[in-house]
Amino acid sequence: LRASIWIAATFKSKMGLQQSMPLDPQVKKLFSLMAVFPQPDIGKITPQQYREAADKASIQLSGEPEAIGGIEDKTIQGRNGGIRIRIYRPLNQRPPHKVVIYYHGGGFVFGSIETHDNVNRLLANLSGRAVVSVNYRLAPENKFPAAVEDAFDAAKWVVSNGESIGLDSNKVVVAGDSAGGNLATVVNIMASENFIERQVLFYPSTHMLDNSPSIHEYGEGFFLTMDQMRWFGQQYLRDVRDAVNPYASPMLADLSGLSPALVVTAEYDPLRDQGEIYAHRLRASGVKATLTRFGGVIHGFISFYRYIYAGRDAIAMAAGFIKQ
């Protein structure tokens, strides 16, 4: 499979994707804002210290919260205990609301409902759907498959109980960014009951052993680094055997029968190639998949839509796809 990744990436100019653009000036401005935050050294601090620093920076850079129709925090029951969720209801829409279930990014190590509050507010308003944000368990305290179990259990809970809280949840959309994109598509793979209408994957992690060109091209100096990716994998996986489990590396799964997908990638992102190759694997498996690369931007750009306007455009694109 690794060889096929290299081959597919070599021919990406034929995929109909946007050709190379200079780094967006708005990204450069964001980098200058990020410079005021101490950069955690993964070799010298604990995962918990890394999480605290990364979450704090994410929240402070998210900007003023978007007005929303309503917010409700709940703790639901999963197979291994309580799972915290937050329900965002869109402005000017009466219940019952159709549903997007959202899984935040953060390398399976950091991130939370709070770090992605801005994204979920905007997605709810633009899509006209309720967004249910899931606070799944994080590594290394809870290694694979804990996050997967929480992600799936939360989706099942919403489908089974949504009507009681004003949600039209017979069919749901799953969405997520980075590690959350991994969880969204894995939930789709697991959902034999076919309750998933569509999947939205922002720069998803799809292969734990990926060695494609973009990892080396953009693995240093563009926000997400190769060293961080390796470290995240070490925190998340129990051992190397987990790396080839299709629930950790959905690139290795049977993708036939999955729901239509929107895959959004960022040009200056080490995860770019694996996201794009995953979209083509979906198509080769008979799944309708829309692939869009945003030029000139970095991993995580939707979280910084206050500074990088392409982030808002990507969320608006997702909202349009959800409403189709």
Language model features with spans:
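A glycine/proline-hinged amphipathic helix-loop "lid/cap" segment
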Residues: L1-I87
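Proline/glycine-enriched tight loop/beta-turn segments at coil->beta junctions
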Residues: G81-I83, P90-V99, S256-L258
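Short amphipathic alpha-helix adjacent to the substrate-entry channel of hydrolases
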Residues: E114-V134
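Gly/Ser-rich "nucleophile elbow"/oxyanion-hole loop immediately N-terminal to the catalytic nucleophile
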Residues: V159-V173
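Gly/Ala-rich beta-loop-alpha elbow adjacent to hydrolase catalytic centers
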Residues: G176, G180, A184
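Hydrolase active-site cap/lid region
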Residues: I189-R241
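Catalytic active-site module of serine/aspartate enzymes centered on a nucleophile-bearing elbow/loop
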Residues: R306-Q324
